[in-house]
Amino acid sequence: MIKMDSDIFDLIKKANETTLKKHGNEISLERAIFLSWWCDKGDCAFCYMSTQKDKIKDPTKARRNVHNIYAEAEMCKRLNWNIEFLSGGYKSFTTAEIKEIATTIKNITGDSVWLNTGITDELEEYGSEIKGITGAVEVANPELHQKVCPSKSLDKISNMLDVAGDLGFQKAITVILGLGETLDDVDYLIDYIKDHKIDRV
């Protein structure tokens, strides 16, 4: 278990030294490209899309125009920003549509993209347009995850990430701090990253 050090500035200095040693002093600007404001699940306690589900009568109208998505990718390329991932709520686009969007973005930017579009069992449909798959773990505590994201099974997320690795994709997870986790949960998070061979958090 990690104990809180009384001198936080020493910890920050040590973290900075470690970061510079491991990653250098260059940073990149990244932007997530959102595909839609609709999510079929719509019950994650922290998510804006959860506040919109009952207000959206026709989910197709909450989808972004794909040409606007492509224009955003072109702007990212011209600004030399990385695209963090494509993000969209559950059932906002089909797998075939996501594949087409990702392929076009790869053609625009010259780089494959990460996906953060929910749990899927259709990963084999994707190819070189996809760099990696992101699992929305969100909370570093399984019991709290069940309360915060009741419709997103942590077991299904974990299985999807393992399958993604078997198919040759890189793997990432999203974790949001401040949803009720404690320092005791850090050990669980570190073990999760190791057990599922996560490339990026």
Predicted segments — roles?
Residues 55-69, 92-128, 137-139, 177-185:
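Canonical radical SAM enzyme core domain
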Residues 1-30:
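An N-cap/entry alpha-helix motif that binds or orients negatively charged groups
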Residues 68-89:
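Short Fe-S-cluster ligation motifs
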Residues 21-68:
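Canonical Radical SAM [4Fe-4S] cluster-binding loop centered on the CxxxCxxC motif
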Residues 83-86, 132, 155-201:
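Conserved C-terminal portion of the radical SAM core fold
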Residues 44, 127-141, 198-201:
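Non-cysteine beta-strand/loop elements that form the S-adenosyl-L-methionine
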Residues 30-33, 54-57, 84-96, 144-145:
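Glycine-rich, proline-tolerant flexible connector loops at the mouths of alpha/beta enzymes
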Residues 21-27, 80-82, 109-113, 129-131, ...:
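Short, well-ordered coil/turn segments that N-cap beta-strands
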